[in-house]
């Protein structure tokens, strides 16, 4: 056996002994690298006579091809073995039971929002929507709040740089009443509508948040009275709190957009809040100036309005003491409502 045949056999043996890609590359360098044995054989051809060079060159090339074939075969074998090992490690047992995906839930305030729409919708109230960035006129002036009213100060209202297309200052709405103004100016009486949505005020503590949710209701018609308003609201709170065992009372109050105005309190006949009067809403007869700004004759039509904080209703319904819990994103709290 000539030396080149022995070299091929040795290379095949070394390649077969390589158990990973790094070892195989080291073995390759021994035979096919810049200083490898086949490379050195090729360099020695220059010392031979032309006839010998041709003959010996063919022998060396044949040996080189056999070594390269052995290298390729071993490289493929290692690659296949690696893939098989990986597949075995990542194998899926199709007999195992599936793992369910975690599901989210409806936020408690959103539950209240949906329930409010459902209750008022069942007695014929529409649902209004409107922009959260409002102009000064719709948020304040149209609702009978004069320019020197404290609510207009930057200590209570988030103002935005710039004006609207009519030059009116822009702000984040402080209540959802502007949606009622917009709705009323586009519709004719009789009007029965609620306006739920996000509102913003410069306030933050255990019972207040700079962003909170309100629902406000508006009823405009002929020949309606406070008795109708009381009946509607009593129907609402009984349906919302799912009990007939409660009372409603109206206390005199003041709001610039209603006259007369009242605070609405409820008292439960049973449960942990039994006997306590709890404020849940403000209400009143729509002020004549507001009626005119909506485009109605206050001598012909009567309007009643009411408004409640959705967080307040949610806190009373579920016995929650701190408003900030709604916005901390704590799953331990939120999972209780799923």
UniProtKB/Swiss-Prot annotation:
Q: Record's NCBIfam families?
A: pheS (TIGR00468)
The organism of origin for this protein = Herminiimonas arsenicoxydans
**Localization annotation:** Cytoplasm
Keywords in alphabetical order: Aminoacyl-tRNA synthetase, ATP-binding, Cytoplasm, Ligase, Magnesium, Metal-binding, Nucleotide-binding, Protein biosynthesis
Cofactor requirements of the protein: Mg(2+)
Main localization category: cytoplasm
Q: Which Gene Ontology molecular function entries are recorded, alphabetically?
A: ATP binding; magnesium ion binding; phenylalanine-tRNA ligase activity; tRNA binding
**Broadest EC class assigned to this enzyme:** ligase
Q: Name one GO biological process term.
A: phenylalanyl-tRNA aminoacylation
Which InterPro entries does the protein's record reference? Answer: aa-tRNA-synth_II, aa-tRNA-synth_II/BPL/LPL, Phe-tRNA-synth_IIc_asu, Phe-tRNA_ligase_II_N, Phe_tRNA_ligase_alpha1_bac, Phenylalanyl-tRNA_Synthase, tRNA-bd_arm
Q: What is this protein called?
A: Phenylalanine--tRNA ligase alpha subunit
Instruction: Name the source's superkingdom.
Output: Bacteria
- Catalysis: reaction(s): tRNA(Phe) + L-phenylalanine + ATP = L-phenylalanyl-tRNA(Phe) + AMP + diphosphate + H(+)
Q: How does it assemble?
A: Tetramer of two alpha and two beta subunits.
Q: How is the cofactor bound, as the UniProt entry phrases it? A: Binds 2 magnesium ions per tetramer.
Enzyme Commission number: 6.1.1.20
**A Pfam family this protein belongs to?**
tRNA-synt_2d
């Amino acid at each position: 056996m000539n030396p080149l045949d022995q070299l091929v056999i040795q290379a095949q043996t070394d390649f077969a002994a390589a158990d990973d890609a790094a070892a195989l590359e080291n073995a390759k360098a021994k035979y096919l690298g810049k200083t490898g044995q086949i490379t050195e054989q090729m360099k020695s051809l220059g010392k031979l006579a032309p006839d010998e060079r041709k003959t010996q060159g063919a022998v060396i090339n044949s040996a080189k091809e056999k070594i390269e074939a052995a290298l390729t075969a071993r490289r493929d074998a290692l690659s296949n073995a690696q893939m098989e090992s990986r597949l075995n490690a990542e194998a899926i047992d199709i007999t195992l039971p599936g793992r369910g995906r975690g599901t989210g839930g409806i936020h408690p305030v959103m539950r209240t929002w949906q329930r409010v729409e459902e209750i008022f919708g069942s007695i014929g109230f529409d649902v209004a929507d409107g922009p959260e960035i409002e102009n000064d006129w719709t948020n304040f002036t149209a609702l009978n709040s004069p320019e020197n009213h404290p609510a207009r100060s930057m200590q209570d209202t988030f103002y935005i740089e710039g004006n609207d297309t009519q030059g009116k200052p822009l702000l984040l709405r402080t209540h959802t009443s502007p949606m009622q103004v917009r709705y009323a100016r586009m519709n004719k009486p009789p009007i029965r509508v609620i306006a739920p949505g996000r509102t913003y005020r410069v306030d933050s503590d255990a019972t207040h948040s700079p962003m909170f949710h309100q629902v406000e209701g508006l009823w405009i018609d002929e020949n309606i009275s406070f008795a109708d308003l009381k009946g509607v609201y009593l129907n609402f709170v009984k349906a919302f709190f799912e009990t007939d065992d409660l009372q409603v009372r109206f206390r005199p109050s003041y709001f610039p957009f209603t006259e007369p105005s009242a605070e609405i309190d409820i008292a439960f006949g049973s449960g942990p809040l039994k006997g306590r009067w709890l404020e849940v809403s403000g209400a009143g007869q729509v002020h004549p100036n507001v009626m005119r700004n909506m485009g109605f004759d206050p001598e012909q039509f009567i309007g009643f309005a009411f408004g409640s904080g959705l967080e307040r209703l949610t806190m009373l319904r579920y016995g929650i003491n701190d408003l900030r819990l709604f916005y901390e994103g704590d799953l331990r709290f939120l999972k209780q409502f799923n």
